[in-house]
A protein has these predicted regions:
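A short acidic-to-branched-hydrophobic micro-motif
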Residues: 115-117
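A cross-family detector of function-defining hotspots
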Residues: 13-49, 53-60, 68-111, 133-134, ...
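Acidic, proline-/serine-/threonine-rich low-complexity intrinsically disordered repeat tracts
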Residues: 1-11
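A low-complexity, Ser/Thr/Gly/Pro-enriched, surface-exposed linker/loop concept
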Residues: 119-135
Length: 201
């Protein structure tokens, strides 16, 4: 069986990926986004790795990076329903329950590093990313696939996860208005096996 070489060979590193923070522009194309206020709030947050390039005099390269604190996320979504460290919620993982789904956010030193929004009803839309490629726009891909099972934001990209009728996950990742990665269900399974995330193996 041949695997898709779409995600690796030929295109050079710079074409696939830049170090610019992703602005979450593709979020506006999520079907029904206008009636899901959490999506606009997600777009206004600034996850960051905390990795900062500095010049010799200590200035941040490209100007100070925008960040979102634990308090910013609380301002957006209210108090979390659970925290890995309730005494110090700005370090660790916090979970919010909202009208339109669940949110899980990771923090380090009070700075938001990653945030995942699992959309209510998204698991009923049995789709996979097999029909899209990096030459599609995020708008086309989201129109074709419909409501995602989950949306993940990190500093360098916004990812959309789908679950097919077998419960297998696949995803695509966007930066600005480009798709820079498509991961099939088979590749996702392989990754889970390698990283030990798949407990069924």
């Amino acid at each position: 069986s041949s695997t898709s070489s779409d995600s690796s060979s030929s295109d050079d590193f710079s074409g696939r990926f830049s170090l610019d923070p992703d602005d979450g522009a593709s979020l506006q194309y999520v079907p029904g986004a206008a009636s899901i206020p959490e999506i606009e709030k997600l777009k206004n947050l600034h996850p960051t790795t905390g990795f900062v390039l500095r010049t010799e005099d200590g200035q941040e390269v490209g100007g100070p990076k925008e960040r979102s604190s634990y308090d910013d996320v609380v301002a957006a979504f209210g108090q979390p329903v659970s925290s890995t460290d309730s005494a110090n919620p700005g370090d660790g993982v916090n979970v919010w329950a909202t009208d339109n789904g669940d949110i899980m956010a990771f923090f380090r030193n009070n700075v938001l590093t990653d945030i995942t929004f699992r959309l209510r009803g998204g698991d009923a839309n049995h789709q996979s990313t097999g029909s899209i490629s990096k030459s599609d726009t995020p708008k086309t891909a989201l129109e074709r696939l419909g409501k995602p099972y989950a949306i993940m934001r990190s500093e360098n990209g916004t990812s959309y996860v789908y679950k097919d009728s077998n419960g297998d996950e696949s995803s695509f990742s966007t930066q600005g208005n480009k798709i820079f990665n498509v991961t099939s269900a088979a590749e996702t399974k392989q990754l889970k096996k390698i990283t030990g995330l798949d407990k069924n193996q």
